[in-house]
């Protein structure tokens, strides 16, 4: 149990069907506008103003899914907690359309990606105020086969002067960050004959700087293409789909030209992670059935490891977690967690959860990627909203040190030895990142200062974002910006 005098508010349980479908949904998020501190309008004209860096603010930008290093860890120091009776200062809020992805923040801009009235919408906001700088739209006809909304799931990525988006139906686009001017676009799902996954496209793009040859910056995405006649009669029978040489594809950021493609694995909802193993850059891509160890320079697959539940209606969505030469995979439908070593470009299994283990005694992540701190892994275990637990697990043994109920399938990031946790039901918590006990420093339901209504409505499935001392959190229909260092 956590040390806290406050009582958790209960959240509505999701239906059985929703539970089965859920897994894809988190790696994602969306965003819109209108602030409680200041109002911004969709009708503002696009601007070509040059992005301004918030260099006077502490810590770093957050230009991609799970931050600059893809592990959900912020370099911010001096987090001001507890927040006091009134909670943290809300700088601005903005309304959302459909979608499940969070913002990316860099150079003074926050880019948000959602769907409104049949169009996928990309907007660039001033990170400090929420003011709309520019907006671009694309028509979309994507329909989720399980009834979830049709907005984007994949988080935009800011790469230098560019922003790259990957829509739910597979439209990959690159635009100038300063004014939204289109640089190139590729209808990936059409060009590579992708059979739609249960929830569309969900894994976010990653960027890699080549060190040899042309030394291009590459955007690497999970594609999972198939033969042109590969569509099964029943669109839910994804077990009948075969891949064809485009599991992962790398494109030149500036031109959109394909640089390499590799593997016949199908796509998952797990965003790949770049890491250094024994002085070599490697990409860890947890595809639909296997984890791949890839040379990002060439796309060469060095090794693979199978880790997925046998159940047809299962997916993997959490990203791999890396510590030194070890990699942790965690899913909730089958085997749970496995710890691998990377030795000479080969995977070596070091431990796995015991057979028939349950989420109450092991780490079985649904979609939220756990964070590592002091040889402990913090995150949510469990498949269903009502019985999910927030836990601290030992990195090497998998043993649970403590567990806390009532937060649903929550997400977290690490900031200055603290965990900022966003519950599925909209509650915001700060916990001490300790194996000894779950010590809650502060918890709050954010309220609109004018109406008293909750700012974060469930479901809250996107991971928090921490950029330049600001915290960005989203619920259904709204993004909220909070100042973490305001005293």
What do these predicted regions represent?
Residues 18-33:
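Bacterial N-terminal signal peptides
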């Amino acid at each position: 149990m956590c040390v806290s005098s406050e009582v958790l508010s209960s959240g509505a349980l999701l239906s059985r069907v929703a539970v089965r479908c859920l897994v894809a949904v988190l790696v994602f998020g969306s965003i819109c506008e209108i602030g409680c501190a200041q109002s911004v309008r969709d009708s503002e004209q696009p601007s070509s103003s040059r992005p301004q860096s918030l260099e006077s603010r502490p810590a770093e930008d957050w230009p991609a899914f799970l931050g600059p290093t893809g592990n959900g860890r912020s370099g911010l120091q001096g987090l001001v907690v507890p927040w006091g009776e009134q909670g943290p200062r809300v700088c601005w809020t903005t309304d959302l359309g459909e979608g499940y992805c969070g913002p990316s923040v860099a150079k003074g801009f926050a880019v948000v990606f959602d769907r409104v009235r049949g169009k996928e919408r990309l907007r660039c906001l001033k990170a400090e105020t929420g003011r709309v700088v520019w907006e671009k739209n694309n028509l979309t006809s994507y329909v989720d086969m399980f009834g979830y909304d049709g907005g984007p799931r994949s988080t935009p990525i800011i790469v230098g002067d560019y922003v790259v988006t990957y829509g739910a139906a597979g439209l990959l686009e690159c635009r100038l960050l300063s004014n939204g001017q289109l640089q190139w676009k590729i209808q990936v799902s059409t060009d590579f004959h992708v059979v739609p996954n249960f929830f569309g496209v969900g894994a976010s793009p990653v960027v890699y700087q080549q060190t040899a040859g042309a030394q291009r910056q590459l955007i690497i995405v999970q594609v999972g293409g198939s033969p042109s006649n590969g569509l099964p009669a029943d669109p839910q029978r994804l077990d009948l789909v075969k891949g064809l040489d485009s599991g992962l594809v790398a494109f030149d950021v500036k031109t959109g030209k394909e640089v390499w493609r590799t593997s016949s694995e199908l796509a998952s909802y797990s965003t790949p992670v770049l890491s250094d193993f024994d002085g070599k850059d490697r990409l860890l891509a947890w595809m639909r059935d296997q984890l791949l160890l890839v040379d990002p320079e060439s796309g060469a697959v060095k090794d693979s490891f199978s880790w997925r539940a046998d159940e047809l209606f299962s997916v993997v969505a959490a990203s791999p977690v890396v510590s030194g030469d070890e990699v942790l995979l965690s899913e909730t439908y089958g085997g749970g967690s496995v710890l691998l070593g990377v030795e000479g470009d080969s995977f070596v299994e070091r431990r796995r959860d015991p057979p028939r283990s349950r989420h109450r005694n092991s780490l079985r992540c649904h979609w939220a990627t756990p964070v590592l701190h002091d040889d402990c892994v913090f995150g949510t275990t469990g498949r269903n909203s009502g019985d999910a637990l927030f836990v601290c697990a030992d990195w090497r043994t998998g043993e649970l040190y403590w567990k806390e109920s009532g937060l649903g399938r929550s997400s977290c990031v690490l900031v200055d030895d603290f965990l900022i946790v966003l519950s599925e039901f909209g509650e915001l918590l700060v916990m001490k990142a300790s194996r000894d006990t779950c010590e809650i420093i502060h918890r709050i339901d954010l309220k609109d200062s004018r109406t008293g209504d909750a700012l974060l409505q469930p479901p809250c499935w996107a991971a928090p974002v921490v950029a330049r001392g600001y915290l960005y959190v989203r619920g259904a229909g709204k993004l909220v910006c909070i100042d973490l260092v305001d005293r």
